[in-house]
From Swiss-Prot:
GO terms for biological process: trehalose biosynthetic process. This is Malto-oligosyltrehalose trehalohydrolase. Homodimer. Changing residue 253 to E: Abolishes enzyme activity. Its main location: cytoplasm. The active site is at residues 253, 284. The keyword Repeat does not apply. The keyword Cytoplasm applies. CDD domains: AmyAc_GTHase, E_set_MTHase_like_N. Keywords: Carbohydrate metabolism, Cytoplasm, Glycosidase, Hydrolase.
Length: 559
């Protein structure tokens, strides 16, 4: 690894890339101040033999300001405090048991998942998650962010594990314990921007683009002068999480905000690093562009899978009747049918919301190139009141929505608590210390999202914690859906037959067919089968070809 430090026997070699600085000193707390040597690329280095694990340090710049290491491995006192040397991992296993076709993902925000809001809290729930049937947990970003309360997308130290969650040792233990249970760990990482508080990289060098902007903060310089070192900073970060913590995969935040005009896009390079270690990488993208997941021979970035917001939007708009914002493009049953058949609803057609033609067809890509959900942190948390879908629809609709995505050919992702009918909201929350930034966040969330709760108030964070009031019927329904998904080999195979009427769908796979009845309907059934699961008791145990009157609900039949 190029950045931060390397422990070599009794010596520690420190490295800082700071081409904007003429001189830099290393200040090791309670040890001394040391002049670093600068090379022609702006790398400052020094080797010391009097420092050890747990020692803390800062860098002193030309203007005498003291800053943490931008590649810090741990910030025990937060984003403005000194960096700490940690014990490097002594063992690395380049084997992973996680296969894309087996993925059933469970998205977790560490701080609100359990009362304690730590990695230890997550560990105590691993048996529960294993029993549910999921195969991987996806951890929302844990790179050090300001304070103790944040979604994680305001992180500023890409290599440092959040102190309030349990730090490096806590995360290492979580990954180890998850692996013992046969669960993979996917880490959500943010390479499109850095947070607005605690970012000292602007003083050091051209880490950030002068050409491009994001709504959330400065974006990395991937394609301008001296971008080679910035790309190295990011690519080594990917490798660091794999080799130091043995994570099984990554979720890349909002890749549509990563702009790179280089001959080889940074996303393709990230995928190369991930695949070198037999890991998985998933992208969040709102471009509806198959290039994200297309293989290199088709000029793609070769990312393993990408999120599909269209799938969520089509189900949400149809079941809730909401038509505001991006939901204005959705609301018909035909949208659900199209997303089932073609992945993207907008795959080259005009979007009224965007006021332009949007997307491209996915072609022959299989279902495991796409991740679907009926809830996630964005779709819940960016609502003004943070409502989960269970507060917006009736119980039968909730079960129908669950079946639609858990039995789809795509990779399903459950948002924490959804599987048992969690009703607590999930708000946006933060813990900044800068008064101007705090005011800006409050005003921005109220204006853009209609959020009346104060993001900075700890009560907003506490209200977002899971209640763990488990609805056993819903939990059992989810558990059986997941079991059926595995037993019927549903994953990846997009060769399903979808037939719909005015208020119903029939979806037929190789070994099954499923009925989705959105309101009482007369339906001509052209298959026969034995009932495996239903949302209520109105469906027959055995069904033959013929015409039936069905109440609202869902049923799954074995052919």
């Amino acid at each position: 690894m190029t950045f931060a430090y390397k422990i070599d026997g009794n010596e520690v070699i420190f490295t800082l890339w700071a081409p904007y600085q003429k001189s830099v000193k290393l200040k090791v707390l309670e040890k001394g101040l040391y002049e670093m040597e600068r090379d022609e690329k702006g790398y400052f280095t020094i080797t010391l033999n009097n420092v050890k694990v747990r020692d803390r340090y800062k860098y002193v710049l030309d203007d005498a300001s003291e800053i943490p290491d931008p590649a810090s491995r741990y910030q025990p006192e937060g984003v403005h405090g000194p960096s700490q040397i940690i014990q490097e991992s002594k063992e690395f296993n380049n084997e992973t048991f996680l296969k894309k076709e087996d993925l059933i993902i469970y998205e977790i925000h560490v701080g609100t998942f359990t009362p304690e809001g730590t990695f230890e809290g997550v560990i105590r729930k691993l048996d529960y998650l294993k029993d549910l049937g999921i195969t991987a947990i996806e951890i929302m970003p844990i790179a050090q962010f300001p304070g103790k309360r944040d979604w994680g997308y305001d992180g500023v130290y890409l290599y440092a594990v959040q102190n309030s969650y349990g730090g490096p040792e806590g995360f290492r233990k979580l990954v180890d314990e998850a692996h013992k249970k046969g669960l993979g760990v996917i880490l959500d990482v943010v390479y499109n921007h850095v947070g607005p508080e605690g970012n000292y990289m602007v003083k050091l060098g051209p880490y950030f683009s002068q050409k491009y902007k994001t709504p959330w903060g400065l974006t990395f310089n991937f394609d301008d002068a001296e971008s080679d070192e910035v790309r190295k900073f990011i690519l080594e970060n990917v490798e660091y999480w794999i080799k130091e913590y043995n994570v099984d995969g990554f979720r890349l935040d909002a890749v549509h905000a990563i702009i790179d005009t280089s001959p080889k896009h940074i996303l393709e390079e990230i995928a190369d690093v991930v695949h070198k270690y037999n890991r998985i990488v998933i992208a969040e993208s709102d471009l509806n562009d198959p290039r994200v997941v297309n293989p290199k021979e088709k000029c793609g970035y070769n990312i393993d899978a990408q999120w599909v917001d269209d799938f969520h939007h089509s189900i949400h708009a149809y079941l809730t009747g909401e038509r505001q914002g991006y939901y204005t493009d959705f609301g018909n049953l035909d949208d659900i049918v199209k997303s089932y058949k073609d992945v993207f609803v907008y795959d080259g057609k005009y979007s009224n919301f965007r006021r332009k033609t949007h997307g491209e067809p996915v072609g022959e890509l299989d279902g495991c190139n796409f991740v679907v959900y009926i809830q996630n942190h964005d779709q819940v948390g960016n609502r003004g009141k943070g409502e989960r879908i269970i507060k917006l629809v009736d119980r039968e609709s909730y079960k129908i929505a669950a079946a639609l995505y858990l039995l789809s050919p795509y990779i399903p992702m459950i948002f924490m608590g959804e599987e048992y009918g969690e009703e607590n909201p999930f708000y946006f929350f933060s813990d900044f210390s800068d008064s101007k930034l705090i005011q800006g966040v409050r005003e921005g969330r109220k204006k853009e999202n209609g959020q009346d709760t104060d993001p900075q108030d700890e009560s907003t964070f506490n209200a977002s914690k899971l209640s763990w009031k488990i609805d056993e019927e819903i939990f059992s329904f989810y558990k059986i859906l997941i079991k059926m998904r595995k037993e019927l080999s549903i994953a990846c195979d997009r060769r399903v037959n979808v037939v719909n009427g005015e208020n119903w769908l029939i979806i037929k796979g190789r070994e099954y067919f499923s009925l989705y009845v959105f309101s009482k309907s007369s339906i001509e059934v052209k298959y026969s089968g034995t009932l495996l699961l239903s949302s209520n008791n109105s469906f027959p145990q055995h069904i033959e070809e013929g015409k039936y009157e069905f109440d609202k609900g869902f049923a799954l039949y074995k052919l």
